[in-house]
Amino acid sequence: MERLQKVIASSGVTSRRKAEELITAGKVKVNGEVVTELGTKVTDKDRIEVENVLIAKEVKEYYLLNKPRGVVTTTSDDKGRKTVVDLIPTNARIYPVGRLDYDTTGVLLLTNDGDFANILMHPASEVEKVYMAKLKGIIKGEHINALKDGVKLDDQIVKPSRVKLKKVDPKTNTCMVQITIHEGKNHQVKRMFESVGFEVLKLKREKEAFFDLKDLQSGEFRKLTPKEVAKVYGLQK
């Protein structure tokens, strides 16, 4: 269910603020009944009229993108940089589910379905996010143990569910480490490694929930299947 004013705005009829004004003015009907309360929630099955005109509901769209470097995870950018939304040709008002840093690559979901996005981002869903990080320096067991014990970020102790050293390159003094987290704090993975003394040179999200980058090259995307969408809704607690 979504708020009435959001559904009206999503249909393209007017802005959300104007939609709120129309609701309080008694110019909106839901299933033939005038509604004036802004907190009213509606479903896809409800019939909504604005000033006696039936609105066309926005069709829900769901995408999986292999985000490339040098693209911002927003719907617009005041610096004129390319956004993740620019990479997907659609008229739907899609937006990213969560965010990846400008130079971070990998799994990113986009949709215009607020409920779908909220399920994936809500802490109760405990969605796993798997990252591969290239670190400056060679991480040791003591550092991995320190991460597993938990590090303090934003006055909160956060712990990865898994940390694995995958590759060591003594010639370049770098290593590849796979780390799995549940939270989605700002710059979380980079800050976690920095807390134990390592700079992240490259970062890629390999997986989120059950979505991975199979058959998707950098910058490519695909639509989710109805089965995948239903599986996300099954995560709701």
Which role does the model predict for each range below?
Residues 1-237:
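Basic, flexible Lys/Arg- and Gly-enriched helix-loop patches that mediate nucleic-acid binding at interfaces
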